[in-house]
């Protein structure tokens, strides 16, 4: 199942706000920008995979689906009120679900958007 539409950043202006004001976190294959303090009962996510990563839309869409699946995996742990943009870097083209899972867990933890009251192993 994909990421519910209520949990997605959909508008260009929302992406721009996160790009301009969000705090940057980087891992080897992913870059994440996080903007907090939004008064909402959930966090919203946007995923960007540029044509620098792959010219083929099918490849870019596959990467986005994998990242959305990882976000769904962590959804019970994610604190509300954040807008997050995840950018796949060109070297991320060869990543699989498990690699994205490890990297996003580290990035979410680094950014402070995961509630550590839940154990990851409990979710698996």
Curated annotation (Swiss-Prot):
Single GO term (MF): ribonuclease P activity
Source species, domain of life: Bacteria
Pfam families in the record: Ribonuclease_P (PF00825)
Top EC category: hydrolase
A cellular component term, taken from the record's GO annotations: ribonuclease P complex
Record's catalysed reaction(s): Endonucleolytic cleavage of RNA, removing 5'-extranucleotides from tRNA precursor
Keywords, ordered alphabetically: Endonuclease, Hydrolase, Nuclease, RNA-binding, tRNA processing
Keyword Transcription attributed: no
EC code: 3.1.26.5
InterPro entries noted in UniProt: Ribosomal_Su5_D2-typ_SF, Ribsml_uS5_D2-typ_fold_subgr, RNase_P, RNase_P_CS
Keyword check for Translocase: no
Gene Ontology terms describing biological process: tRNA 3'-end processing; tRNA 5'-leader removal
Assembly information from the UniProt record: Consists of a catalytic RNA component (M1 or rnpB) and a protein subunit.
Family: Belongs to the RnpA family.
Record function comment: RNaseP catalyzes the removal of the 5'-leader sequence from pre-tRNA to produce the mature 5'-terminus. It can also cleave other RNA substrates such as 4.5S RNA. The protein component plays an auxiliary but essential role in vivo by binding to the 5'-leader sequence and broadening the substrate specificity of the ribozyme.
Name this polypeptide is given: Ribonuclease P protein component
Organism expressing this protein natively: Synechocystis sp. (strain ATCC 27184 / PCC 6803 / Kazusa)
Gene: rnpA
